[in-house]
A protein has these predicted regions:
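Structural microenvironment flanking redox-active thiols in thiol-disulfide oxidoreductases
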Residues: 98-158
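Short active-site neighborhood of thiol/selenol oxidoreductases, capturing the structured segment around
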Residues: 73-103
């Protein structure tokens, strides 16, 4: 009588290129899923960082310098203009001047009709030194931004509503600078925060302008 061989069969090795192909296909499926998910969340491929859902923006109330005198100023989100809001200070050595210059470059690239529907609001994080007149002189050097002095404690509340942090940092030999969040917030004509850019992104004028135009054309949407 013949006895059956009870030894388990040796596993057959899979060629390396088959394993590589399986790994590539798995990676492609994963990337495809990520791409579909991001397109569902935001069908338009924004350059800036998009809010998961548009958030109501906080208004800005303070003092500005216009017509040769200090006057009250209020930015009320939802009054019909697409608005870029940036928090900084006039003694800033790099981030603030770069941000204002980049935003002006994007504004200049717009059509006259687009410029009429767009504004930049520059909020000082250093109200002790940044008087309304100093702010106006500083902002106008870079372009057409409206600069605003907001006093404490209102400033702290406003900054928190935009998730902006800031702190005084002493300088060697005296004085101080303000360390702060370097984001610029884009608010649509319906008053919703739609996206933000970091200063490192703002130099890409064409891509920034593309974001602005999309937000202009879709107020209240994503």
């Amino acid at each position: 009588m013949t006895r059956a061989d009870t030894r388990s069969a040796e596993p057959v090795g899979r060629p390396w290129y088959v394993s590589a192909l399986v790994a590539v296909l798995a990676a492609l499926l994963l990337l495809g899923g990520v791409w579909v998910y991001t397109r569902i969340r935001s069908p338009f491929p924004y350059y800036g960082t998009v809010y998961d859902a548009p958030q109501q923006a906080a208004g800005v109330s303070g003092l500005s310098f216009t017509g040769g005198k200090v006057t009250p100023y209020a930015f009320t989100p939802g009054e019909g203009k697409t608005t870029a809001v940036f928090f900084g200070f006039t003694h800033c050595p790099d981030v603030c001047p770069a941000t204002l210059a980049y935003l002006e470059r994007a504004r200049q690239a717009m059509t006259p009709a687009e410029r009429a529907k767009f504004q930049v609001v520059f909020v000082s994080l250093d109200p002790d030194r940044d008087t309304p007149q100093r702010l106006n002189d500083y902002a106008k050097y870079f372009g057409d931004a409206r600069s605003v002095q907001v006093k404490e404690p209102v400033l702290a509340t406003l900054a928190r509503s935009y998730a902006v942090s800031y702190v005084k940092a002493p300088l060697p030999g005296g004085g101080y600078q303000i360390n702060h969040t370097s984001a610029t917030f884009l608010i649509d004509a319906a008053g919703k925060k739609r996206l933000l850019w970091d200063v490192t992104q703002l130099g890409e004028t064409a891509r920034v302008l593309r974001d602005i135009r999309q937000v202009m054309n879709t107020p209240g949407n994503t």
